[in-house]
Curated annotation (Swiss-Prot):
InterPro entries: KATNIP, KATNIP_dom. May influence the stability of microtubules (MT), possibly through interaction with the MT-severing katanin complex. The lineage of its organism: Eukaryota, Metazoa, Chordata, Craniata, Vertebrata. Residues 198-218 have a biased composition (Acidic residues). Residues 188-197 have a biased composition (Polar residues). The modification Phosphoserine is found at residues 658, 688. This is Katanin-interacting protein. It comes from Mus musculus. Residues 330-354 form a coiled coil.
Amino acid sequence: MDGQALRKVERSRSCSQERKEGYSKDMVTDFDEKHDEYLILLQQRNRILKHLKAKDPVQLRLEHLEQGFSVYVNGANSELKTSPRKAVHTDFSRSASQAEGSQDYGRRTLFREAEEVLRRSSRTAPGKVQRRGWHQKSVQIRTEAGSRLHIEPPLDCSEDFESQEDVIGKHEDATGEHTQELRKGLGLSTSLQTQEDGSSDEYDSIEEDVLSETETEDPVLPVHNRDECPLPSHDAVQKDVPKDQELEGRHPQATDTLVVMEFNPASKGNKMDRILSAKRKENAEVFIPSKPDSVLNPQPPAVFPEQERACSRSGSRRDRPLSATRKAYAAEDREEDASAVLKAIQVENEALQQVFLSHDPELHTSPQQDTKEPPAKSWSSLLKAKEDIPELLPATPVTTDPELCRAAAGAKAVSQAMDGMSPLGSRQQHKLVGVLQTMESDTTHLSQVAIPTEKPVPNSEEKWKARVDEIEDAIYVTMEILSNWGNASWVGLTEVQFFDLNNIKLYVSPHDVDIRNAVLPGELGCLVNRDLVSKKDPPVWTCPFHPPLQLYFIIHNMRQLRDFGLTMIKVRNYWTADGDLDIGAKNVKLYVNKSLIFDGVLEKGGGEAPSDCTIPVDLQRERNESSDKALSTGWKESKGALKMAALSDARELGLSCSQPAESLDMTVSSQGDFLGEKVNSTSGLKNSLSKLQEDVRLLATPASMGDGPSVPSSSSPGKCLPLEEEPSLIQQLESLRGRKIPEPTGKTPHWLQPSLAGMGKKQTVRKPKPLWLSPEKDLEQKSRFPSEDVMGDTPGEVETREKGPRREQGRTSSWNVITEERAPKAFSKACGDDLDIFSQLPNRDRPASGRRALKKEASSSHGDDRPASKEDTQASQTLPWLQWYGEQEHALHASWDSLTAFDRAHRGRISALEPQGDILDEFLKQQRSSRHEEFPAPCREEEPEPSTEMGGDSDFKIPVLPYGQHLVIDIKSTWGDRHYVGLNGIEIFSSSGEPVQISSITADPPDINILPAYGKDPRVVSNLIDGVNRTQDDMHVWLAPFTPGMTHTISIEFTHPCQVALIRIWNYNKSRIHSFRGVKDITMLLDTQCIFEGEIAKASGTLMGAPEHFGDTILFTMDEDILEAIFCLDDTFDMDAESLCGLQPEEALRRPSTADGEGQDERPFTQAGLGAQDQVPGLELQTSPPVSEVTTPEPGIFYGLCLRLNLTASWGDLHYIGLTGLEVVGKDGEALPIQPHQLSASPRDLNDLPEYNDDSRTLDKLIDGMNITTEDEHMWLIPFSPGLDHVVMIHFDRAQSIAGLRLWNYNKSPEDTYRGVKIAHVSLDGLCVSPAEGFLIRKGPGNCHFDFAQEILFGDYLQTRLPPAPTRRLDAKSLERASMDYEAPLMPCGFIFQFQLLSSWGDPYYIGLTGLELYDEHGERIPLSQNNIAAFPDSVNALEGVCGDVRTPDKLIDQVNDTSDGRHMWLAPILPGLVNRVYVIFDLPTTVSMIKLWNYTKTPQRGVKEFGLLVDDLLVYNGILAMVSHLVGGILPTCEPTVPHHTILFAEDTDFCHQEKHAIISKPEEDQDIQMMNENQVITTSRRKPGTADPALRPKTCIREKETSRRWRC
């Protein structure tokens, strides 16, 4: 027992020991396996984390784009983007987990832990708060899972967990690998949204997320002082600096390879513009912010910027670790960074100092006491306009401290610049460097131009002598009124005229007249631009009198004549028929260009006309007058005010006037200002000013910015133009307006920049430029401002000419922003405007322009004859800074230059360049008169000379009722067409009110038939008096070739001499584009007396509108009795209001050509419309005399045995010809019996052809009796050979009396009707009974709507037919067919007149008419019978179940039209898919001159509304027939009411027109189909017609014949 127990115990111990050993072995094995498995899982976890942290190229590029930002992802816009930016990370973890095996719970746990770490790290940023005052200390935050995390700032302040080596390597990748990509993507971008698109939609979403989440404020980063210890993490980064500096010479952050991007600070919730500072290029354009931003003072950060720059993604980016957001190299800028930036700035400053130290030493001696404002404001303005940054330091004396400017070396400047840059943040440093780079590029242009300024400046006396021989641009006349003839409060004048050396009156623009010392200026334009064409006398100039009153006149040399001058001034004193003549001026002084030429008394007005005072001008005295007399007391008195105005102007612009020349001149525009212009310093200006105050004779050449010694090759081309060369458009405008149109201020394009070699050679060998690219004329000779000499040369007080409400603000050019040539006279305009504003503000009504035109214009120029004050100089120097605000001005002027260049190279045929009401009107008007004077017509001497009262000044007064017999109209110009001139008509009325009888009318040139390509054009001069004036028909207009400079006259001879009371000119009105061929400037002579000279209004080109829309009416009397008599006899006003409202435009026959030909002077071809002589010859065959060789006792009846028909022509088919039926009409009108054996034909039928065997269209079908058909089994068809005979023979058994033929033409289908017979020659027993040209056979209709048989009676051709009388174009008057939509042929001629009735006035089931009448060419009504009228559907009897209705088509011609009885009307059903038709059929071609229609009266809604008229299937008219209104019966019950008829008029006969003028159909407004759509979806639909009516709902109607009782008619 015990032994067994022991053995059991031992056995159990051994087993347990074995189990323990096995267990321990199992434990060791299990631990090893678990450990290995753990290591494997850990390795997989690390791999997953590493893969998740890996960045694709898109992320890497985005991080490089974000470098330099401070991005807050959970700011105001953190939740705007909720879609995941990239789902690849979470998907990857899921896919990786599945790859390792979804059954492994531990691995999935590791994957979730890895993702949880990443998720937690993306949510550690605070919420939506402004991180302005973060403190660098430890914080505790609760994660989303609930645990707390203790966060401390790392020692190295790194933003990620990567080693410095990784940072170095990836920084090298960033700076080297992606440099070109960054340049390409951001070099010229102005916002992040314009970056280069990514390679996938994923990148687009990333970019949008960045844009939406980075809207919050980015505080300025401070630069650490030198005593601060840099962080260790900078060491690795700093190693990259020498490499970059070897390449670029600057710190990497200041180089071209690194793009700095930054958001502007937000201000009170307002979003700010994003601005990119990209790589600087040589000719980069100045960036202009898209909208102004306010500059705020950002709060400096209190902690390291890592916390500020660390951006945690929003919920859409949870899969991205925080460390991957951006790899910033350091927490803040180290001393090495700042020193590198300062070193780069030092390089910029040294380059600038070398440029300016090479100039005259006077540049650096400007005293500091001249500074009116601290330099900080100017620098802020400079950089704000350049980059719109938050704010710069209070003072940045890099280039603004005068001590730096005086230093010969740059050491002190560099040290002070470094001290001034130290408070700046890195971004501000980058931006300042960018500004300096732009300034350097500008300075490069300055240095190229400023070299010639070292030449000695000639004194003003030499320049004055040089100007004497040059072209004088303008003459300045001053009139000083000292007293009047007795009126206590008013003074006035009638007119002032100026005459040149050839005794020709000079044109003076109303805008070139100004006044001084007057509260109300009055209508100054009346002094020089009196409108003598108006019906009443124009107003006379008056104004309140406060002596001395000064009037200023500027007379421009528009033609650039060298002998430009005045010989005489004519002054007409105040005079009105019923006015106070004491208002006239008495004691007057007159100055011409500083010279007193008159000091005396003007005669008082009296009698029937104002008195003239002619004042001669002493030319020698005027030209030799010294400039010493230029200074006036007015200039001295206004000097102080001008200083104040200029200073206020500069302050208004927000620019400082204290910068020395370096800071101002380096931003001068380089496009138009460096073409031969010089830039001097402000210091030189001040020295010159001190001399000018001692010696006023040097006023003409102060050494200011611009008019120093210029390069001869550059300035000389701009002095004057040859006489034979036309000045450019801009130069002509400058001459007219008296002001300089500036050059654009942007960078000069590389194709316009002068080469460096050329600049080094002082520009003496520069290739000449085209005229439109040449430098503008010198301001002193070319565009002297209207107020220059006035201000300096006239006695008394002086003020600018631009004064009063008459000067439109809109005419002030906004191009005057730039002081384009920096000339000394770039100041008078400024002072003039400012003095005008400040001293006369209550008297002006000048609105402030939104573009600040007044302020910009105020600094454009100064006059020669006044010294420039210091404030004025500074104000003018500040204007180059406006180029940053003037980008649109650049584009505007560039467009103008392009148009000018195009105008030089391409001359269009129609050059209507005159916007009415603009100053261009005056300019072009003067140009026309100048051209006509320069090129007098050689034939002008043969014309009768005007009366002597015209004189040389072309001045006249419209006479009252001029008397004469021979009227000559001299056409000076057209409305733009340079090749043709035309008119529609001329109407002349005498003093008795009757139209003047005209015996003859001629023209020179007569018409366009004198040209080689013409000969029968209907547009002849006799059309002018045919009475058809409101027209677009070529048959009623006159057109002649026009050659500028030649004579174009119209001569009209009256039957008897008479007094002319009214002349109406109807201008050329063919179309809107052709209306430019109308006359514009004309002169009228009646028996050599000028009765009119002026402009005729251009026609509208349509047929709508009042008579004034078609030309002009000239009245020669205001007598009411005469005008009333004219009104009664004037057909123009004899139209009722309905007809006027119904005028519709007519379509042109063909579109005019608008393209230029090969030669600019080639005259384009013009062609008239289809006239009466162009009708189809076949339609006029009835006019030929009959050719009949058979004479019988009974006219028209022929007796014979054998009848022969020869078919010689078809209606168009070249291969077949045929007929449907044939009958021979006997003596009694009955058809003669014909048997098949009596018929023979050659060819017999189609079976004669080899390809036909058993064709059914045989000869016997002609007499089978089935004639009204469209089945060809009942027709005859044979092959047709043009030119050969196709004969049908009928052999009667015995001789028959034959009166004619009855034919049914081939009618298989509308297309096959062209196989029908057109011409048939008929002979009987060998004798011809048809005309020589044969009988004209009517073409078949192609349907069976009516019996289309044609009866040819031989007797109708026996009478000799006279051709229709020619239209009397000299005395016939008619009204234009107002309702036509096209050019209708005159009096259409044809066989079948078809009325297509398209719609009714509302009834969907029935349509009807009461009656119709047709009139022939003689105005006689054409008798119609039942054989002539047909309709389809025929009547209501066509309906099922309706019969016996009396409203059949024959009721249309029963001549009972004025009735409401339905038994005399026609009514037909409207059937679905069919158009109701009414046919009027003639057997002979019939000419119709007029058609009268009576609409359906019984039920007006069943009347015809829309209809069309076709003549032989050709549409000749369409319109709308008015509905019959309520009819009023007569006094007696038996009296029928009068039903109004409607007329379609084709004739021009006077009787027709006057008789039917109130019945002509006028086209009212039509209903239209309207669809309103929104985003391609139909919203509403309005249709003019209801849907197809249901035939089942058709109402029954029927009127049967009944015995009529006796009815009385009255």
